[in-house]
Amino acid sequence: MPDTLRINGQRLWNSLMELAQIGATDKGGVKRLTLTDLDRQGRDLVVGWAREAGMTVTVDKIGNVFMRRPGRDDSLPPVMTGSHIDTQPTGGKFDGNYGVLAGLEVVRTLNDQGIVTDAPIEVAFWTNEEGSRFVPVMMGSGVFCGAFSLETAYAAKDVEGKTVREELERIGYLGSEEPGRHPIGAYFEAHIEQGPVLEDANKVIGVVPAVMGLSWYDCTVSGMEAHAGPTPMGLRRDALQVATTIMQEVVAIANRYPPYGRGTVGMVQVFPNSRNVIPGQVKFSIDLRNVNDELLNTMHEEMLAFVARTRQETGLGIEIERVSYYPPCPFHPDCVNAVRAATEKLGYSTMDVVSGAGHDAIYTARVAPSGMIFVPCKDGISHNEIEDAQPAHLEAGCNVLLHAMLERAGVAKDAVREGEAASA
């Protein structure tokens, strides 16, 4: 495939900006929660673009959408790319959306140049990646890859008691294809990094060898509420004081296992939350991550051991429950190498970046060779209305996606017209 082949960066940007108008917020972000009317509008727009590009569209029973460009040999499993178009309540324009529309731009570029691939090319968008309306996160790809059942997903409810199945049917995306029956030859996902590493290193492309595993916990510390004035310090059963020592240990554990140890307390509830009452109970979340599963398990064991010691030393009631776990996900060497080779061929500055966030690709990796491409986002900010990315970086990532997919899909002989380079 000629090294001069490039996508149309302006067309990609225009598509991103048009999709971002659906659910646009006053602060420049997007609120398009999964399976809402706005999600339906976004889905309809992307599906319409796919059909304009000559693609056929299939929807499965969890609402995952697969848009297919035929290959010379349609019996071959497709080379797929994709991501999601649902957002956080205060989301940005690029998280997920970039991966879907970069895939669409790959197809448009192949159409422009009359290129026929040996294997079909598919672009997917997965249902409820964000998990901001329904739990679990990455629902569509998880059901597709067998991480949990369709029945479990259907039964999930939002805060108003509406179920996933009801909402899929209501918006017209309750498909007929059985999840997981759709073959994948290889899967690539282009994404903004959602962190500051690439920008800090002044690199354009992140080659992603793996995604960190994580353990999530709910922790409750129970003491005794009492008046803040009359109760001496030595006679208190202060739940917040003890909870704080556990929170500090979360950070200490992460710092013991650099460079990929992560420890976060993101949610805290204090009861009764009164200025002059010693807290009687504290509930909080714990998030531990590492790219090495053995180290992640060590962090888990150290967390439990510290809680047990603290319970014994303080005499307070302390409960900790692991509520979610997924192991680190190393991506397939062939896909990682395809991304690396495409980046080097195109001359972009690059570095390896381990993903600290979960993506649909961690589930596709269970059923097909998978890989990811990162591009920088401004100040590393994501899941925020001010999320931003440079058009040139988005274009570069899409060019890498194009060449990596072509390397895997193959190009039929005599299938490229002269003058094949699209405008950059």
Language-model segment annotations:
Residues 227, 231-256, 300-305, 350, ...:
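His/Asp/Glu-rich mid-to-C-terminal helical/loop segments that flank catalytic regions of hydrolases
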Residues 12-25, 82-83, 350-400, 405-408:
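Zn-dependent metallopeptidase/amidohydrolase metal-coordination segment
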Residues 47-51, 56, 60, 66-167, ...:
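Active-site metal-coordination/substrate-binding segment of hydrolases
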